[in-house]
Amino acid sequence: METNKLYECTLIIDGGLQDEAIAAAMALVQRVITEKGGSISSVLEIGRRKTAYPIKKKTIGYYAHIEFTAATSVIAEVEKVIRYEEDLLRYLIIHLTSALLEMRKRVEKYSVVIGSPEDSALAEAAAASDTVAK
């Protein structure tokens, strides 16, 4: 019997699609993972961003990130299904090893997430000091 391992899947969906089509593509990927025996632990939808270079002649992509646990054999089955989905510009599934998880903890310890309460508090303090200086 195979043991479940932790994986992360990063997706770039065609950003020119309507919100409903993007939601359908996300639901498809999540459904495939769960139907094949995986268990989704977190979903982070980053949103529309400009790509670094054109992918399939598209320059805007909708970025999303899914963390899940699954057996090794499930990954090939999931890739087989999502590989031919036309709305997905790119995808990458990687196994999260203990070294990667440790590195992630160190990065999170020393970084502030953009849009976090700490970040907005710093921005408000900077804006307040600018108005006082004027």
Curated annotation (Swiss-Prot):
Domain of life: Bacteria
Protein name per its UniProtKB record: Small ribosomal subunit protein bS6
Alphabetically ordered keywords of this record: Ribonucleoprotein, Ribosomal protein, RNA-binding, rRNA-binding
Function summary: Binds together with bS18 to 16S ribosomal RNA.
InterPro entries: Ribosomal_bS6, Ribosomal_bS6_sf, Ribosomal_S6_plastid/chlpt, Transl_elong_EF1B/ribsomal_bS6
Gene name as annotated: rpsF
A Gene Ontology biological process term: translation
Entries under SUPFAM superfamilies matching the protein: Ribosomal protein S6
Family, as annotated: Belongs to the bacterial ribosomal protein bS6 family.
GO molecular function: small ribosomal subunit rRNA binding; structural constituent of ribosome
GO-annotated cellular components: cytoplasm; ribonucleoprotein complex; ribosome
Pfam families listed in its UniProt record: Ribosomal_S6
